[in-house]
Regions:
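Phosphate-coordination/substrate-recognition cap region in phosphate-metabolizing enzymes
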Residues: 39-113, 117, 189
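GST superfamily/GST-like fold recognition
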Residues: 160-164, 204
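Glycine-rich phosphate-binding loop signature in dinucleotide/nucleotide-binding domains
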Residues: 47-49, 143-152
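Generic beta-sheet signal
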Residues: 6, 152-160
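Acidic, low-complexity terminal tails and accessory targeting/binding regions
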Residues: 2-4, 74, 96-107, 150, ...
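Loop-to-helix element that buttresses phosphate recognition and phosphoryl-transfer chemistry
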Residues: 13-64, 125-137
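Short glycine/proline- and acidic residue-enriched helix-loop micro-motifs
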Residues: 112-131
């Protein structure tokens, strides 16, 4: 039996998150708090050894992955000769395009507040959740699943909208039957790892890690409950 593990988490906090601004594909840096959140994510996955690491092409995701890996002692094999991390950047896991809403406050802007969301309805000038799911599905089928089937471990650091898209791709959320139902609006905390355990390419268990007790239990292959996520910073 081939056992592989996929770990996914969102990047750390940015100023756009802090100020409730829609981010989408805009490339904004981590705040000091976001950098510390990334390091904490690394401490949570300490003891896990990854064969492959991926991030989106945006700096907030890549830097979160690098800072997280820097807190681990079991992933030095992913370091390049110059000491930087071998993290593959993939455009298929870039944040959902916020289009005309990018840079605007999603709590107070009336156009955003009153926009009727649907799974297959894109925001003005941007993407729908359905479109994001399609490209995340392509990324998973081409880059991740073959590695899990070989019993390898994969780290993916991305964005809130992409974590939601992974829910559909991995089967932990159901795609609306008519394609036009409500989108996944699950709150996604910054830099909080979720572990997906696979056997022979099939998902058998998943859980979120938010304390050291859980990661210790995970490393011992013991079942642990999903912890309630801390409130996230919004916006991509």
């Amino acid at each position: 039996m081939k056992k592989g593990t996929l770990v996914i988490f969102r990047h750390g906090q940015t100023d756009f998150n802090k100020n409730h601004l829609m981010t989408g594909k805009l490339d904004v840096p981590l705040t000091a708090m976001g950098e510390e959140q990334a390091r904490e994510a690394g401490r949570l996955i300490e003891g896990m050894s990854f064969d492959h690491a991926y991030s989106s092409t945006l700096s907030r995701a890549f830097n979160t992955a690098a800072l997280a890996l820097g807190q681990t002692t079991s992933n030095d094999h992913l370091k390049k000769a110059d000491g930087t991390w071998h993290i593959v950047r993939d455009a298929d896991i870039i944040e959902v395009d916020a289009g005309d809403f990018a840079g605007r406050n999603h709590k107070t802007d009336p156009e955003i507040v009153n926009f009727k969301r649907a799974f297959d309805r894109p925001v003005p000038g941007g993407e729908s959740q359905k479109q994001a799911v399609e490209r995340v599905g392509r990324f998973f089928e081409n880059e991740v699943l073959p590695k899990l089937e070989r019993g390898e471990n994969v780290l993916v650091v991305c964005h809130a909208g992409i974590v939601r898209a992974f829910d559909f791709v991995l089967g932990t959320e159901k795609v609306p039957a008519d394609g036009g139902g409500n989108p996944n609006k699950k709150r996604i905390p910054n830099a909080t790892p979720t572990v997906y355990e696979y056997e022979d390419g099939k998902l058998v268990r998943f859980f979120q890690i938010d304390n050291q007790k859980e990661i210790d239990a995970a490393n011992e292959n013991k079942s642990t409950p999903v912890k309630k996520a801390r409130p996230p910073k919004s916006g991509g």
